[in-house]
A protein has these predicted regions:
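Domain-level detector for long C-terminal conserved domains
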Residues: 1-7
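C-terminal target-recognition/interaction regions appended to catalytic cores
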Residues: 9-188
């Protein structure tokens, strides 16, 4: 394992010059970043994104691709703060659509809005007709391990998205608690 120490004089220097190769697992402890490449020790069934997708949905879930291409694209924009400080706002490119053959990624509270983190999937209507759509509230519930319509309590749809973006993934918490329980039992 290699170790690197980065030293910056101020936040502006960090913002302008920070670059770091993060691997797929890591923590920050006492201001130090520890990152390693890990491989899951799991041989069971893996739920893929396509497993939670509903085949036929209302038209209101389909979106205009161009706006999302811009939002999910890379940016490097000079901005000025309220105090007059000039800085560079930058974001890297995100994939326009989510890969249905992989596990779904984390959902944010802004899921129901038009933003770069919104999950988009590609729907092939025919060979020449490919559309893009956002997830339905039920798909969001499934992605987090909740039952269908769990948030359908009469609240507005945007709040259903918010709830799922603010939720813990039930299956993940359950599996982690079982594993922690096993570790604790072995230590007794």
């Amino acid at each position: 394992m290699t170790e690197a120490e980065l030293d910056f004089n101020n936040i502006e220097e960090v913002s302008n010059n920070f670059s770091f190769k993060f691997l797929n697992t890591g923590i920050m402890r006492d201001g130090n970043i520890y990152t390693v490449k890990t491989v899951p020790n799991y041989n069971g069934r893996k739920q893929l994104f396509k497993d939670i997708i509903i085949d036929s949905v209302e038209d209101k879930y389909f979106i205009e691709e161009d706006k999302f291409k811009e939002m999910k694209g890379s940016k490097r924009i000079k901005r000025i703060s309220k105090t007059g400080h000039e800085y560079i706002f930058s974001e890297g490119t995100m994939s326009l659509i989510d890969d249905l053959n992989k596990p779904g990624r984390t959902m944010l509270t802004s899921e129901g809005t038009k933003n770069r983190s919104t999950h988009l999937i590609e729907v092939k209507k025919s060979d020449n007709d490919i559309k893009f759509r956002k997830l339905t509230p039920i798909e969001c519930e499934r992605l987090n391990g909740f039952d269908d319509d769990w948030t359908n309590t009469g609240m507005k749809e945007r709040f259903r998205y918010f709830c799922m973006g603010n939720a813990l993934v039930v299956g993940l918490v359950t599996k982690m608690s079982m594993e922690l329980s096993n570790i604790i039992d072995k230590e007794k």
